[in-house]
């Protein structure tokens, strides 16, 4: 069966109609340039939906729309934006984010549906907050450190609530923290309640953009209150429950704050816990920095660094070169990753039925 060909005139009309539809779609999808002023530099201090709060060079904050051509925008991004002009009838038009500068770093977390999701940009360091209450867990600290190493962002370990320790307890905690000091990590002991140790922490935060990570109940919000000089109703905080020993997480959206002593912090609920299930086993291994000198020295190339004969890592543990707790936590992380990955595959396969 032969097909009727369009005449040249019909082809021109089809093309014109197509271009008109594209133009109409583009006009509906974005914003009129005449509604906005000159371009300026700014930083995103909060992002929600198709809007962002942008701080200009003079410190003023502007609620902005976001160009649909911008595929990714998160708190901490440095942007080019334009303020809105007064429209007809005195209606004020929001500003608009025109472009995003290249990121020096981006903090991401795994998402079961969206893959790896960015949550903050241009971070200089991740403050890993732990505490002796609800529990001092070296396993959790090690998980955060692996995540920091995988993202190539410098960590700072902060142990909160040291005011609850007696002399023997403080001695024990320092012995535990020496494990991390001895492999090059910075460790600070503080109390948000008594403000002990806050001066060294302020110095470590000055002139840097930091983000606080840690489980609920370790006192992240209380620590931020003390560092920012804010009252408790400005950054909400809940005391640890006497019954469960667990605090309640109260922050709901990532936001950038300025420290009075200099430096910035991004407070985000997205970094309460870093999932590691998206990482390869090799990335977990490389996340333990003290392993590096021994990798490649095992007797067998496919060494699992467990009970394998001739394992250089296990030999280093037996010789006191690698902390036994770190080696054990390494295997715990690998085991938990395998369990989550199996569960994830099952969930996705069942959802495809």
Curated annotation (Swiss-Prot):
- One record GO biological process: ribosomal small subunit biogenesis
Question: What domain of life does the native source organism fall in?
Answer: Bacteria
Q: Where does Zn(2+) bind?
A: 298, 303, 305, 311
**Listed cofactors:** Zn(2+)
Q: Provide the alphabetized UniProt keywords.
A: Cytoplasm, GTP-binding, Hydrolase, Metal-binding, Nucleotide-binding, Ribosome biogenesis, RNA-binding, rRNA-binding, Zinc
Q: Show the ranges annotated as biased composition (Basic residues).
A: 10-23
CDD domains the UniProt entry points to: YjeQ_EngC
Subcellular localization(s) per the UniProt record = Cytoplasm
Give EC number(s), comma-separated. Answer: 3.6.1.-
Q: Name one GO molecular function term.
A: GTP binding
Q: Where is this region: Disordered?
A: 1-24
Q: Name one GO cellular component term.
A: cytoplasm
* Occurrences of domain CP-type G (ranges): 104-274
Question: What are the binding positions for GTP in this chain?
Answer: 160-163, 214-222
UniProt keyword annotation of Glycosyltransferase present: no
Q: What does this protein do?
A: One of several proteins that assist in the late maturation steps of the functional core of the 30S ribosomal subunit. Helps release RbfA from mature subunits. May play a role in the assembly of ribosomal proteins into the subunit. Circularly permuted GTPase that catalyzes slow GTP hydrolysis, GTPase activity is stimulated by the 30S ribosomal subunit.
Q: Which HAMAP family match?
A: GTPase_RsgA (MF_01820)
Quaternary arrangement and interactors, per the entry? Monomer. Associates with 30S ribosomal subunit, binds 16S rRNA.
What protein name is recorded for this chain? Small ribosomal subunit biogenesis GTPase RsgA
Q: Which organism is it from?
A: Klebsiella pneumoniae subsp. pneumoniae (strain ATCC 700721 / MGH 78578)
Organism lineage string = Bacteria, Pseudomonadati, Pseudomonadota, Gammaproteobacteria, Enterobacterales
């Amino acid at each position: 069966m032969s097909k009727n060909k369009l005449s040249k005139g019909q082809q021109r009309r089809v093309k014109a109609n197509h271009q008109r539809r594209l133009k109409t779609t583009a006009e509906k999808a974005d914003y009129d340039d005449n509604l906005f002023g000159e371009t300026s530099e700014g930083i995103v201090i909060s992002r929600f939906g198709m809007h962002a709060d942008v701080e200009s060079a003079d410190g003023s904050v502007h609620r902005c729309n976001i160009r649909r051509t911008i595929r990714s925008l998160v708190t901490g991004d440095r942007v080019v934006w334009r303020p809105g002009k007064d429209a007809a009838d005195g209606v004020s038009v929001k500003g608009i984010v025109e472009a995003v500068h290249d990121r020096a770093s981006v903090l991401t977390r795994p998402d079961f549906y969206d893959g790896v999701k960015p949550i903050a940009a241009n971070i200089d360091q991740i403050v890993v907050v732990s505490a002796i209450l609800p529990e001092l867990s070296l396993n959790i600290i090690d998980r955060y450190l692996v995540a920091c190493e995988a993202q190539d962002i410098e960590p700072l370990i902060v142990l909160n609530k040291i005011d609850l320790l007696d002399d023997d307890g403080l001695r024990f905690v320092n012995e535990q923290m020496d494990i991390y000091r001895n492999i090059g990590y910075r460790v600070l002991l503080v109390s948000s309640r008594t403000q002990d140790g806050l001066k060294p922490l302020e110095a470590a935060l000055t002139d840097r953009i930091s983000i606080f990570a840690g489980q609920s109940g370790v006192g992240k919000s209380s620590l931020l209150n003390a560092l920012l000089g804010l009252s408790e109703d400005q950054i909400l905080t809940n005391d640890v429950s006497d019954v469960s020993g667990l605090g309640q997480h109260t922050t709901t959206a990532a936001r950038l704050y300025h420290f009075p002593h200099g430096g910035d912090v991004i407070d985000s609920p997205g970094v309460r816990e870093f999932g590691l299930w998206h990482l390869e086993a090799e990335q977990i291994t490389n996340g333990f920095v003290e392993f590096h000198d021994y990798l490649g020295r095992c007797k067998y190339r496919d060494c699992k660094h467990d009970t394998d004969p001739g394992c250089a890592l296990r030999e280093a543990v037996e010789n006191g070169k690698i902390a036994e707790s770190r080696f054990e936590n390494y295997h715990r992380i690998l085991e938990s990753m395998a369990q989550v990955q199996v569960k994830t595959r099952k969930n996705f396969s069942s959802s495809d039925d």
